[in-house]
């Protein structure tokens, strides 16, 4: 790492979805995405839905190639992780400028998705699945 990259301005954001937590850093650069030390497309298995979710906040503001995205993410699966990264990137972009908040909010990138796995209840097989009923 050279001295110019050490002095570069870094914007932080944290995102969550299901059981996933992502810590996102935005650094002025060329639009490269690195997730847990691996290239973003490799980490997300080249899945276009996951890749577009990660890039969505940057494309909303027209900054797709302006910042490098460095991510540490843990917990959950790829769906939860990609949406957590999306929210973390959006929050980091709000740190960049206050004017970025309104377009990101209207697109829904700043809102936390509250859906999570429902707990299993006693007397049932799963969260809502009852055991087979026998009349006789």
From Swiss-Prot:
Residues 103-116 have a biased composition (Basic and acidic residues). Residues 117-136 have a biased composition (Basic residues). GO terms for molecular function: RNA binding; structural constituent of ribosome. Coiled coil: none annotated. SUPFAM superfamilies: Ribosomal protein S5 domain 2-like (SSF54211). Keywords: Ribonucleoprotein, Ribosomal protein. One of its GO terms (cellular component) is cytosolic small ribosomal subunit. One of its GO terms (biological process) is translation. Residues 103-136 are annotated as: Disordered. Belongs to the universal ribosomal protein uS9 family. This is Small ribosomal subunit protein uS9. It comes from Prochlorococcus marinus (strain SARG / CCMP1375 / SS120).
């Amino acid at each position: 790492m050279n001295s110019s990259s050490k002095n570069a301005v870094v914007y932080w954001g944290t995102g969550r979805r299901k059981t996933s937590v992502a810590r996102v850093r935005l650094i002025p650069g060329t639009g490269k995405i690195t997730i847990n030390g691996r290239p973003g497309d490799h980490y997300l298995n080249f899945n276009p839905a996951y890749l577009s979710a990660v890039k969505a906040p940057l494309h909303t503001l027209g900054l797709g190639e302006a910042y490098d995205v460095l991510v540490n993410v843990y917990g959950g699966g790829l769906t939860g992780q990609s949406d957590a990264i999306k929210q973390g990137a959006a929050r980091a972009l709000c740190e960049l400028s206050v004017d970025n908040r309104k377009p990101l909010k209207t697109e829904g990138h700043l809102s936390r998705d509250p859906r999570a796995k429902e707990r299993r209840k006693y007397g049932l097989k799963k969260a809502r699945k009852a055991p087979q009923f026998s009349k006789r």
